[in-house]
Regions:
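Generic alpha-helical propensity signal that fires on short helical segments
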Residues: 34, 41, 68, 77, ...
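Secondary-structure transition/hinge residues
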Residues: 35-39, 110, 140
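Surface-exposed, charged secondary-structure patches
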Residues: 70-121
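Residues that cap or initiate secondary-structure elements
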Residues: 58, 108-110, 142-144
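Short beta-strand edge/turn micro-motifs at domain boundaries
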Residues: 101, 122-164
């Protein structure tokens, strides 16, 4: 006897592909908003734009990070040696009409620094390259995919990929 239930509605594979592409683009747009806010952590407009990519609960630690940058007088800049990247190495999982899970590999090569001022040279605080493999949970809220949570799977210091 077959006890599996038949879904009342199905989603066409090309619709799932479109949703996956929209979720991936949202994550890439989020990265741009992150870098803009972290490059100028005192700019409330940039911070607010970054905040729109997260649920309030998920944004808390990022707010703390931006506050720490501001308190320390530090900002981010791009590395001239290793490019930052985001790739999608795993399966996309459509969890429901407005929920998805996306596996990402983020290579963080951003440089935390004290910017040059008054003729003083830039001071590098942290220029480590870190690759992180994460499952990110997203929800469609008011026509925008936002991050609601996630789980770090692995993290590697001084690596520029999530290949293991």
């Amino acid at each position: 006897t077959n006890t599996a239930t038949t879904p009342t509605a199905t989603i066409a594979p090309d619709s799932i592909a479109e949703i996956e592409a929209a979720v991936q683009q949202a994550r890439l747009d989020l990265e741009d908003a992150y870098f803009a806010a972290a490059s100028d952590p005192g700019n409330q407009q940039l911070r607010q734009e970054f905040r729109t990519f997260y649920s309030p609960e998920a944004f808390g630690p990022l707010e703390d990070f931006l506050d720490d940058l501001l308190a320390d007088g530090t900002t981010l800049r791009m590395s001239s040696d290793v490019p930052k990247s985001i790739t999608f190495p795993g399966d996309f999982e459509f969890l429901g009409p407005k929920e998805a899970r996306l596996r990402i590999c983020r290579v963080d090569s951003d440089v935390v620094r004290i910017p040059p001022t008054n003729g003083r040279a830039e001071v590098i605080v942290d220029d480590r390259v870190v690759a992180t493999l994460t499952d990110v949970l997203l929800a469609l809220v008011e026509e925008k995919w936002i991050v609601t949570g996630g789980d770090r799977i692995m993290q590697w210091q001084e690596r520029d990929s999530c290949d293991f």
